Amino acid sequence: MPTFVDRVVLHAAAGDGGHGCASIHREKFKPLGGPDGGDGGRGGDVRLVVDPSVTTLLDFHFHPHQRASRGRPGQGSNRSGADGEDLILPVPDGTVVLTGDGEQLIDLVGAGSAFVLARGGRGGRGNAALASARRKAPGFAELGEPGELLDAVLELKTVADVALVGFPSAGKSSLVSVLSAAKPKIADYPFTTLVPNLGVARAGDHPPYTVADVPGLIPGASEGRGLGLEFLRHIERCSLIVHVLDCATLEPGRDPLTDLDVIEAELAAYSADLSDRPRLVVLNKIDVPDAADLADLVTADLRARGLDVFAVSSATRRGVHALSLALAERVAALRAAAPSRAATRVVLRPRAVNEPDFTVTSHGDGFLISGAKPQRWVRQTDFTNDEAIGFLADRLARLGVEKELARLGATAGVEVTIGDVTFEWEPTLSGGGLGGAGLAGDGTAVDLLGADEPGAGAQAAAAGERSPGVPTAAPPRPAGRAVAATASLGPRGSDDRLSGSVRLTRAERMARARRARLSDADADADIDASGADARTGGAVDADA
């Protein structure tokens, strides 16, 4: 079972937002309580945080799927749902986050560095938040927005001060074991080390420094031979490169100078930046017969190249102390010369005044609408609710989508795609269309509403044509149907029952009927009185 993993594929899923609640307040003696549906909670984020106690990506190797909790739905009585908890994933220092296409998202260096890998979805608004002067009691609520889904590649680049590089079996693991308290696996066969071994070394009064034992490199490592690419990335962050050369090798065609040239060529081929790193040379295994003589022979050539050379023996610890002091001094000098890490600046870029909220482009035989607002509105719309669909249509119309579609020549019935939803577009006609007849919220022509009964104007005209000698006792009929036609011009999905503009409560209907009966009785009394006066007057004239 692996104990060190430096590359994994992580499938992150943020929490979905909670749905809003569509609820009406119910309380004794309050028949028109109004909407009281609460908002849904926000979905949890998936966050990566650098933890110094974590040194490997092993946990994600066994658990590659990570999901944050979703937001709770809203409830009645204006109770909002709880937000989902963020999922905190600890990662080692030096973790690089990449997309599936290899694009780098973030380089996490330093304890506490954090990155939001996937953001949770917004919670849907309840009908209490959707109420307005025109829509006083919405019978719908917004759905929670889905959380983000992301497949990311996590790569660990070891953060160390010193990198020990060289051919397999050059003695790198043995050297790191005597420089520090690390206990790597040591054997007499190539590629014993398959993962970097880290150790913390101390020398004199200098601060401690970190040493990384990089697995062995061979010719073609920069092209991936011998897992070269997996090993070379652990050198990128090291500030000092130490070439460990085997002076006791018996392989034909190999000697310390040749090995140095091969490793230098692979480093330069992998990254040009590595060619500029400070470096020194360690001639290892001088305890082996004839190895010390070979070390003395090549030392002059190495120093002629401007390299510091140290001859050591990991077995007898000869020269190890001097090497450790030199490494500590070099690391301290490099740390002092390194520029301080600047704090990340948060740049706020204001949105342009004339920047459109959406774009409409031709897409096959239809049109494609892109934009954060319309796509979010579609995701949060409950398409099983007619009022919610009408609300979406109103929002798109106010945003100017209909005007843009009409400008581009869209006709009724053409397919329009917004996000993952495709529908047939039916233009909403304003007043004056269809010969002056506007459309109500449900698509019915306003002039057809109440056409079976005369309105107030028709009743007044009819009353004027009656005989002036016969008074009209009944008052003008309330234009209830006309009011209904006017109210239907409001946005689709408005609740006329609670608005009080169209439908009357039982008490109001009874009061109106009572007033009508009283008016009829008064009119009958006036008619009887006028008839009696006429009869009396006629008798007087006859007597006269």
Swiss-Prot record:
All residue ranges annotated as the OCT domain in the record: 350-427
Residue stretches of biased makeup (Low complexity): 456-472
Q: What are the required cofactors?
A: Mg(2+)
Alphabetized InterPro entries for the sequence: G_OBG, GTP-bd, GTP-bd_Obg/CgtA, GTP-bd_prot_GTP1/OBG_C_sf, GTP1-OBG_CS, GTP1_OBG_dom, GTP1_OBG_dom_sf, OBG_GTPase
GO cellular-component terms in the record? cytoplasm
- Where is GTP bound in this sequence? 166-173, 191-195, 213-216, 284-287, 313-315
Q: What class of enzyme is it?
A: hydrolase
Q: Which UniProt keywords apply?
A: Cytoplasm, GTP-binding, Hydrolase, Magnesium, Metal-binding, Nucleotide-binding
Residues recorded as binding Mg(2+), renumbered to this chain, are 173, 193
Could you tell me which residue ranges the Obg domain spans? 2-159
Cellular compartment(s): Cytoplasm
GO MF term set: GTP binding; GTPase activity; magnesium ion binding
Q: What is its main location?
A: cytoplasm
Describe the location of the OBG-type G domain by residue ranges.
160-332
Provide one Gene Ontology biological process annotation. Answer: ribosome biogenesis
Q: Where are the residues of the annotated region Disordered?
A: 63-86, 456-544
Highest taxon in the source lineage? Bacteria
Q: Which HAMAP family does the protein's record reference? A: GTPase_Obg
Q: What is stated as this protein's family in its record?
A: Belongs to the TRAFAC class OBG-HflX-like GTPase superfamily. OBG GTPase family.
Subunit structure as annotated in this protein's UniProt entry: Monomer.
Q: Protein name, please? A: GTPase Obg
